From Swiss-Prot:
Main location: cytoplasm
The protein, known as: Glycerol-3-phosphate dehydrogenase [NAD(P)+]
Entry similarity comment: Belongs to the NAD-dependent glycerol-3-phosphate dehydrogenase family.
Job description of the protein: Catalyzes the reduction of the glycolytic intermediate dihydroxyacetone phosphate (DHAP) to sn-glycerol 3-phosphate (G3P), the key precursor for phospholipid synthesis.
Positions of NADPH binding: 14-15, 35, 109, 142, 258, 282, 284
Cross-referenced NCBIfam families: PRK00094.1-1 (NF000939), PRK00094.1-2 (NF000940), PRK00094.1-4 (NF000942)
Pathway assigned to this chain's UniProt record: Membrane lipid metabolism; glycerophospholipid metabolism
Gene Ontology BP terms: carbohydrate metabolic process; glycerol-3-phosphate biosynthetic process; glycerol-3-phosphate catabolic process; glycerophospholipid biosynthetic process
Broad class of enzyme this protein falls into: oxidoreductase
Catalytic reaction annotation: sn-glycerol 3-phosphate + NAD(+) = dihydroxyacetone phosphate + NADH + H(+); sn-glycerol 3-phosphate + NADP(+) = dihydroxyacetone phosphate + NADPH + H(+)
Gene Ontology, cellular component aspect: cytosol
Native source organism of the sequence: Shewanella sediminis (strain HAW-EB3)
Residues annotated as catalytic: 194 (proton acceptor)
Amino acid sequence: MKNTADITVLGAGSYGTALAISLASNGHRTLLWGHEPEHIANLKKDKCNNEFLPGIALPDLLIPEADLATALAASNNVLVVVPSHVFGSVLSQAKPLLRDDARIIWATKGLEPETGRLLQEVARDILGEHYPLAVLSGPTFAKELAAGLPTAISIAGTDVNFIKDLVELLHSPKRLRVYENDDFTGLQLGGAVKNVIAISAGMSDGIGFGANARTALITRGLVELTRLGEAIGAQGATFMGMAGLGDLVLTCTDNQSRNRRFGLALGKGLDVETAQQEIGQVVEGYRNTKEVYTLAKRLGVEMPITEQVYKVLYQGGTPHEAAKALLGRDQKSETPDS
């Protein structure tokens, strides 16, 4: 089947729209699907995603589409950008509508709810072995990407030719640099764990602890990410790159991060429900914390920061209690195994 679009993006939230804007601005006809017809109608009418990215015009090559079948028939390249807790359901909806030559990439950051499985495993369970898979991950705030500010990300997947084609689609000398990576597992994990650590950094700043504590959390958070990654077969070096250290620093230090702002609200004394309401959009790290904690417990991997964030979010703990528990841990050597 011939393509009528270069790529289809599933998910018309802030990040999906930002990636679609970047692709269309790069000269590629891009279909953007969203599950709410009224939202898509507003995108068409306003030529702007006023709900998530107000003030940023949609390029002419970006075509909003409310019908999933039409969107998936338009291109064999499918970019999924939906929250991790609906990733499986969106793939299940898409499966009977996918073209035989479809190739699937996602920019979703997270693991499967309840099980803590990588999204690669979820995709294979639903779609089988037929379709090439890839993941896009790295330090990206949607608003900056949509505005054309310089951004760098990493990409990994199961098919070399698919990766090459994606790099050609995504790369822009003016706005987006794409690094190829051969660690499919590592890129998927980094995007989930960094959200958990960002919540901890926000809680620390909300309490008023300052830059020293924030930096310690980022550094030890990187240790936790690497430890868990190596336990599931990822390459430790991956976490020194865009999808590890890069995403971790970005999300922990800038208030554009919903996860960091969520943590700030908790640190200032708000309860979990009120803090989420204050953010007003999906806080991926809330679910990611449970996913990462579940995976770490299943594998017997020690992740003290993650454990304390989990206690605050799901067991009624407080940020002050979490800080006391972390500072009161037994002394040990600062090594990769500590």
